[in-house]
A protein has these predicted regions:
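Catalytic machinery of carbohydrate-active enzymes
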Residues: 1-280
Length: 280
């Protein structure tokens, strides 16, 4: 039996859906197909349970694109569709499909509508889509299982030594924590922790998400304002401080903290960040 997930959005949206998709595959023993934008399809390399990706640009699809998608979802024998997209076109397409169970937050094509929680960690909010089909969902318990080769390659890229490894991942966008502070922070830490190893990486992208996930998993702690690196750290179970992110949008787990400032990230001092890292 097969399940179809329609998941619009960017790479962060895809990563946040990984635990829910994995839960359906594991608990129902369904084969999984995912429709998502081609630019973010690389994220699904992280989940071997996905048997097929259907590249689809939800935001600017033509009528011909929708017709092609209908053809794709009519051919396999799908028993379930979890629809995170919205709009009349997707409803028309699904209403003409032969999928008997169609779950969505809204839309006339849904055989059952769900009410996702607002607030909290978005990955856990998808539990609302799984409850009607008897699938339990604890996103915080999910962990990525990465290929041994990818982890070995990541380890080879880290600084030599046996001290704790701090991975820095700034977003590199206007309003980010100032670049000079990112660069100076490791030196500040080494005054009390001489063996610290550190590496700064630019923003993650979907095309290289496996490599970034492996770098995160090979580290001891992550300091990030890059949203994709943050989500990967959560799914790898690596301690993390997320700059610019409210703690309520993160799982309530030891070692995971959000750090914000009312007037912007440039108001955060190195001491604020050190305290969040437990190094003050």
């Amino acid at each position: 039996m097969r399940a179809l997930f329609l998941i619009p959005g960017d790479a962060v949206d895809q990563v946040q859906a990984l635990p829910a998709v994995a839960a359906v595959a594991q608990q129902l023993k369904f084969a999984i197909q995912v429709a998502c934008a081609p630019a973010v399809a690389g994220v699904w390399k992280l989940l071997p349970a996905v048997e097929k990706l259907i590249p689809f640009n939800f935001g600017d699809a033509s009528l011909a694109d929708w017709a092609n998608l209908l053809g794709s979802v009519r051919e396999p024998d799908f028993q379930l569709c979890i629809n995170l997209a919205g709009g009349r076109q997707v409803d028309l397409m699904l209403s003409m499909s032969h999928i008997p169970t169609r779950l969505a937050a809204a839309g006339f094509s849904a055989t059952q509508k769900v009410n996702p929680a607002t607030g909290g960690w978005p990955a856990q909010a998808l539990a609302a889509y799984l409850q009607p089909i008897g699938v339990s969902h604890d996103a915080d318990a999910f962990r990525l299982v990465l290929p041994r080769e990818a982890l070995a390659e990541a380890t080879s890229r880290l600084p030599a030594g046996d001290g704790p490894m701090l991975l820095l991942s700034p977003a590199g966008v206007p309003g980010d924590w100032p670049q000079q502070r990112w660069q100076e922070l490791p030196s500040r830490i080494r005054t009390s922790l001489p063996g610290l190893r550190s590496l700064e990486l630019g923003p993650a992208d979907a095309a290289h998400v496996l490599e970034r996930a492996a770098m995160v998993a090979a580290s001891d702690v992550v300091l990030a304002s890059d949203p994709l690196s943050e989500e990967l750290a959560l799914l790898c179970g690596v301690p993390m401080v997320a700059l610019g992110r409210d703690g309520d949008s993160l799982p309530q787990r030891p070692g995971v903290k959000g750090l914000t400032a009312a007037t912007g990230l440039d108001a955060l001092t190195p001491e604020d960040v050190l305290a969040a890292l437990g190094l003050a």
